[in-house]
Amino acid sequence: MSKQQIGVVGMAVMGRNLALNIESRGYTVSVFNRSREKTEEVIAENPGKKLVPYYTVQEFVESLETPRRILLMVKAGSGTDSAIDSLKPYLDKGDIIIDGGNTFFQDTIRRNRELSAEGFNFIGTGVSGGEEGALKGPSIMPGGQKEAYELVAPILKQIAAVAEDGEPCVTYIGADGAGHYVKMVHNGIEYGDMQLIAEAYALLKGGLTLSNEELAQTFTEWNEGELSSYLYDITKDIFTKKDEEGKYLVDVILDEAANKGTGKWTSQSSLDLGEPLSLITESVFPRYISSLKDQRVAASKVLSGPQAQPAGDKAEFIEKVRRALYLGKIVSYAQGFSQLRAASDEYNWELNYAEIAKIFRAGCIIRAQFLQKITDAYAQNAGIANLLLAPYFKQIADDYQQALRDVVAYAVQNGIRVPTFSAAIAYYDSYRSAVLPANLIQAQRDYFGAHTYKRTDKEGVFHTEWLE
């Protein structure tokens, strides 16, 4: 009896669609789900596909060619550990487990270490693109043993999204948790992109009272230029979508934005690494405060503040917001890639930043035209400390910073909330400052805690008895 070339565990929408994607490239696929009903449902809904169902773990594992290639698409956390534990009794040394879930990178490092000690290969793989991407071609970020990656690379390259230049959006990221770390930072950048867009929406509504149709037209025009990206493309559609009663749907959606925790993970890691991920971290908090709906409604009746006044010339203000958005986006990506560099140094991953930007160009949620600019910047100078220093981005900062300053000033004066726009200009001004007021903070630390300090005019480390 012939054996299947790869197996997929987990038949929720992402696992199901990845299995169908793999099958559509000519591979035979074994499928398994903890509940028999889910597996039967997938088979019934996809007649004629080369998906072979199995209803016990042992039969599933034994149905695969060796070395076995098993893709896990199960709930991250304890669910992943349980799935691995159920597979291990039937695996042979050299078999490969691929975790395609939204897994915390430290868990991937642990699993890689544990499974390697038992003779198994483990590839922690970030997958971005949602359910449509899983079916038609996602961006894929695999990390783990390089030799194990080579055994699954042919499949991953065939199922990945394809950029405009014909390159598949998959590359070997690095050892152990590197793939899931890059996916985590991708998600943090996604948070930043979405919050910047939300703030632009608030500015255009508050400052110009644009209608939904005008907002859609504005985003359509923006999507044809520097800001061209998946998120701008879907946002223009959102503005004009109506419900069955003829109401604009976005206007009746409750203003509470949920989250799955991946933005928080990115921010927590930045603190561990000492990285100033201010814009991306600032994009997490608005989701939290949005969930305080009852408190906000009550506070709106008690706390005073300015009412938004007209922002002036319509075309001029729209262009200022566009420029502020683009520079804010650049700052967000500069912070994200700076954190990737810090993590690469900390965990010895030897990340290739140009390649990472390349695989974000299609398939994933943050896919955007300007990612090619990031690839170009690292291709020209792989060791650049910060993307803001690359010639293209430096020129944009020169040309667009006044618009960002004007937009933030207008927003503050008119009570419009722009935390990520504000974080963008604060980071930019801090990063370009040769001197910061941190000298006073260090003096305070020495005063109350004898933490010592360095001087600008002398070598050495000093402590002062401040009360003498």
Swiss-Prot record:
Function: Catalyzes the oxidative decarboxylation of 6-phosphogluconate to ribulose 5-phosphate and CO(2), with concomitant reduction of NADP to NADPH.
Pathway listed: Carbohydrate degradation; pentose phosphate pathway; D-ribulose 5-phosphate from D-glucose 6-phosphate (oxidative stage): step 3/3
SUPFAM superfamilies assigned: 6-phosphogluconate dehydrogenase C-terminal domain-like, NAD(P)-binding Rossmann-fold domains
Record PANTHER family: 6-PHOSPHOGLUCONATE DEHYDROGENASE (PTHR11811)
Gene3D superfamilies: 6-Phosphogluconate Dehydrogenase, domain 3, N-(1-d-carboxylethyl)-l-norvaline Dehydrogenase, domain 2, NAD(P)-binding Rossmann-like Domain
Protein name: 6-phosphogluconate dehydrogenase, decarboxylating
Sequence similarity: Belongs to the 6-phosphogluconate dehydrogenase family.
Subunit record text: Homodimer.
Lineage, uppermost ranks: Bacteria, Pseudomonadati, Pseudomonadota, Gammaproteobacteria, Enterobacterales
